[in-house]
C-alpha cells in the first residue's frame, strides 16, 4: 500500500479517445451523458478531471521526480483527513515538450474513473469541431482535463456499498427475492471476497452470503 502517490494533471486529446488509445471498460448511460454534455457546453469547461492510468515509464518518472526535487510546490497543505497535498507547476517549455514526447511512447491509457465525463467531453469537442470547420487542433475543445497515474502508484480498494434498510422486507424475504437473479450460498463468519466476475459478498443480520449471478 504506497504511502505517497503522484500524478500529472494534463490536457488529453479527444482524438486519443476516438482512436481507442484511451481504453474504456464500462458502458455509459445516455441520460447521464446528456446531462454532462449540457454542463460542459454551458460552463465551457471540464470541471472535473478524468482519472486515467498507464503502465509506468521510468523516463517519465525521472522527469517528474527531478522537477519536484528542484522546485518548490505552489500548494502545500494538510487536509482535514490528515493527508498532505502538494502541487507543482511545470512551466518550462523544454521540459513540457519532453514529457509530451515521452507520453507519446505510452501505448495505451486506461480510464480508471470518468467514463461519462470523458464521453461527454469528447462529444462536446466534436460539436465544437462541427461548428468550427476550420479548427486547427490546438483549440481547447480538442482536449479534456485529466489526471494520469502510473499503474505502480494505484491501489484498488473494495467497492463496498452499505444499504440503509431492507425497504420493509425481512432477511428471509430479501434472500428469497435475490434467488430470482442470483445463486445464494451461505458462508462462514469470515468476510466474503468475490472470487470472480459476477459474484458479490452480502453481509446481513450478522451472516455472510456469496451471491453469484445466474446465467
Where are these regions (language model features)?
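Surface-exposed, charge/polar-rich loops and edge strands
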Residues: 4-215
Amino acid at each position: 500500500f504506497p504511502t505517497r502517490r503522484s500524478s500529472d494533471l494534463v490536457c488529453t486529446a479527444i482524438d486519443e479517445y476516438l482512436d481507442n488509445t484511451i481504453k474504456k471498460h464500462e458502458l455509459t448511460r445516455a441520460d447521464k451523458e446528456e446531462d454532462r454534455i449540457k454542463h460542459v457546453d454551458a460552463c465551457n469547461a471540464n470541471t472535473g478531471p478524468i482519472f486515467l492510468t498507464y503502465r509506468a515509464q521510468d523516463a517519465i518518472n525521472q522527469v517528474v521526480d527531478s522537477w519536484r526535487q528542484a522546485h518548490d510546490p505552489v500548494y502545500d497543505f494538510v487536509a482535514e483527513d490528515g493527508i498532505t497535498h502538494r502541487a507543482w507547476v511545470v512551466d518550462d517549455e523544454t521540459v513540457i515538450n519532453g514529457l509530451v514526447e515521452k507520453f507519446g511512447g505510452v501505448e495505451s491509457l486506461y480510464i480508471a474513473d470518468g467514463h461519462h465525463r470523458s464521453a461527454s467531453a469528447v462529444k462536446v469537442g466534436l460539436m465544437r469541431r462541427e461548428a468550427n470547420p476550420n479548427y486547427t487542433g490546438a483549440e481547447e475543445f480538442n482536449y479534456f482535463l485529466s489526471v494520469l497515474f502510473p499503474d505502480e502508484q494505484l491501489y484498488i480498494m473494495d467497492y463496498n456499498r452499505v444499504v440503509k434498510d431492507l425497504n420493509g422486507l425481512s432477511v428471509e424475504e430479501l434472500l428469497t427475492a435475490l434467488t430470482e437473479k442470483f445463486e445464494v450460498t451461505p458462508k462462514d463468519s469470515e468476510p466474503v471476497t468475490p472470487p470472480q466476475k459476477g459474484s458479490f459478498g452480502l453481509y446481513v443480520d450478522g451472516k455472510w452470503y456469496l451471491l453469484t449471478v445466474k446465467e
